Amino acid sequence: MALSRREQRRSGASTFTKVREACAHDCVLLFFAEDRADWIHIGPIANRLEELGNHVLRLTSDPADTVIGDQGGLFTGGIVATTRLLVSLPPCIFVTTMTDLGTYHLKRSINDVKYVYVFHSLLSTHRAYRDHAFDSYDIFLCSGPHHVAELKKAREVFGLNSRELLETGYCRLDYLIKQEEQFVQSDRTSPSVLLAPTWGPSSLIEYDLELIVQELLGASIEVVLRFHPMSTRHQPELGAQLMTKYGSDPNFSLDQSFSSIDSLMGADVIISEWSGVAHEFAYGCLRPVVFVDTPKKAHNDTYSQLSLGCYEDDVRESLGALVAPRDIGSIPEVVTALVKESPDWKSKLSELRGRHVFNPGRMVPVAVEQIIDRMN
C-alpha cells in the first residue's frame, strides 16, 4: 500500500535521521532505488553484501516499494525530501542504477560519498541515454567491454573527472541464466513469441504493432504482448484496447507483470526493436531475437562526438534476424525458421554472451568483492 502524503513527509524526515546515525558509527552501504523495479538490478548485490555481515541500508523514493515492509527499506519522501537527503548524505558508499545524477534535482552530496553505478541495460551508454547521464559517478560496474570503452572515451572527449571502470557483468543475467538452467519447456505444436516493444518514437507502437499481432495470430503463433513500463505510464489505454480487439483469440495474452520472467522463459523468440530486454532474453535464455529495424533510439545529439559505434547496432543481426518495417508480413516465416534452428542458436548465443558480457552467471559475487575492496 502506498504511503499518504503526511506519511511520506514524516518518513522522509525519519530516513534522514536514520541514515545520519548509521553513517556516524559504521561503514554503511546505501542502496538507492528510484522505482521498485530497480531492485531487479541492485537487490541481489545488496542481499549478498548483507549476508556477509555488511551494514546495508535500502533507500527508495517509491512509496509503494515492497522493500519498505519486506526488507526494512527506508522511504526517502517526496521530491523535496529526497533532494535534501541526497545532497546532505554523510560519507558512505552509495549504490544505484539511477542515471542522470547531478543533471536534474538529485545532486551529489556535499560530503565525501562514493557513487557506484550498476547498469540496468546492456545498451551502449552514449546514444540511448541523455547528455551527461553518467558524468557524476565515481565507480562503474560495467556490464561488458563496450561500456568500458565508451565511458573511457567520454572521459577523454568531454574532460570528465577520473572514475573507476570495473569489469563486473550484468546482474539480471545471473538470475535469468539460473532460471533457464531449471526451466522445462512445455510441449506445444506452434511457436510462442514475446512481443516486447520499447517506448518512445522508435517503438513498434508507432510502427504497425497491430499488424505484427495480426500476422502472428494468423499463422497460429502464440503472442504474449509486454509493454515497456514507460509506455503503460504514458499510454495506459493501450493494453485494454488490444485486449478488446484480440483478447478472444486463445493465442493472444497481455503480460502486465514487469518483474515476472514467466513470459521470457516461455517464449521461443522475442520480437522487439531497441528494447534492452531483447538482449537479456538472447543471453539469458539463449534463444533468438527478431529485431524490427525502426529508427535508432537516440536520446541526445552528441553521441557521434565519441566516434564509436553502438553495441546494439553491432549485434542486431548476430542475435537473430533483422526485419525492415516494410517486411513485417514476413515475420511469421522468420519466427518459424528461427525456432527450427534453435539448437544452433543456443551455442552461438552462448559464445556471443561470453564475448560481450563480463562474468556471465557470476556478476553478483564479482560485484560484491569489488565493492568490499573499495570499502577498505
Short names for language-model regions:
Residues L85-V87, A133, S186, E215, ...:
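Structural alpha-helical scaffold elements that stabilize or flank donor/cofactor-binding regions
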Residues G73-A81, F252-Q256, L319-S330:
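Short acidic-hydrophobic, aromatic-tinged amphipathic segments that line or gate anion-handling sites
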Residues F134, S162, G276-R355:
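Catalytic binding pocket for nucleotide-activated donors in carbohydrate/polymer assembly enzymes
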Residues A2-A13, A133-I205, P229-T232, K346:
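A nucleotide-sugar donor-handling region in carbohydrate enzymes
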Residues T82-L86, E237-H279:
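Donor nucleotide-activated moiety binding/catalytic core segment of transferases
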Residues L30-I177:
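Active-site and donor-binding regions of nucleotide-sugar-utilizing enzymes
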Residues M1-C27, A33-D35:
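Membrane-proximal basic amphipathic "stem/tether" segments
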Residues D38-N54, C171-M243, A324-I328, V339-P343, ...:
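Conserved catalytic-core segment of nucleotide-activated headgroup transferases in glycan assembly
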